[in-house]
Amino acid sequence: PTAYASIDPANPPKIATHNFIDLDPYIRITKIRAVYGHNYNYGSPEYDLTGTSCSSMKHYLDAYTSDQRWDGNFGSYDTRGVVKFYSPVDGNMHTVVPQETEQGTEYQFYIYPTDYQRLTFTFHHVDLLEEFVSGGSVTAGQHIGYIMRPNGQGEIAVSINNGVNLQYISFFDVMTDEVFAEYQARGITSRDQMTISKEERAANPIPCTLGDGYGGKFYSASGDQEAFNEWQSGPDNWVELE
């Protein structure tokens, strides 16, 4: 295939030959179109300018329970500087954007697979190895950095640029069977269970506060924020690992 050939979002190539992160410490993962974190679908047809129906098109991986997050009681284990990120593919790291935090400089960046330039892997909040702060070529499985934030989560977004807009898909849609086997060993039974369908999300629209400076935080349309928070932490949005 030519590197710039179009890609079918419903049937993307399974090119991620390595997991993007150390899976061992993680106990739960959000689904695509979950309402956790903040609205994340900018540049796609699903982006709702009114903030009426919002969703996150990235997977969050958490090593802690929702109770630990609420209480700030993480115990002795800290993911920061311990959990490693890897390149899932042979490709190039581009658009490396630094951001200063209390802990130092963290980075957001894109990895474009060599053979599929319309596909993009987006990484956030990474303590990047020094050799990559200007980008450059990467190989599948290459260690590129660590979790930056204290008790930080893992995050990954995958998008297809069709020349007009972006279409976000799941990391599970592009991983090889060998990589998926790592997740199967932790109780994931199908790739599909990691995505809430567009139709399902539209049938249960969740609003967010666009323009809030935080990327658009989700909130309860009914006003019962406590019940909403509990639902947000539950199985409609998260898949528990074994």
What are these regions (language model features)?
Residues 80-82, 86-131, 153-158:
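Zn2+-dependent peptidoglycan hydrolase active-site motif and core
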Residues 106-111, 138-162, 168, 173:
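Short hydrophobic beta/alpha edge segments that flank linear recognition/processing sites
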Residues 3-107, 139-140, 191-242:
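Surface-exposed, glycine-biased beta-strand/turn segments
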Residues 21, 126, 170-173, 239:
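Intrinsic-disorder/low-complexity peptide segments enriched for small residues
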Residues 53-58, 104-106, 116-118, 151-155, ...:
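Short, solvent-exposed loop/turn segments at the edges of secondary structure
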Residues 160-208:
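Polybasic, proline/glycine-rich intrinsically disordered low-complexity segments
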Residues 88, 132, 137-138, 144:
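Short, well-ordered loop/turn sites that connect or cap secondary structure elements
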Residues 101, 133, 166-168:
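Short acidic, gly/pro-rich beta-turn/loop elements at beta-sheet edges
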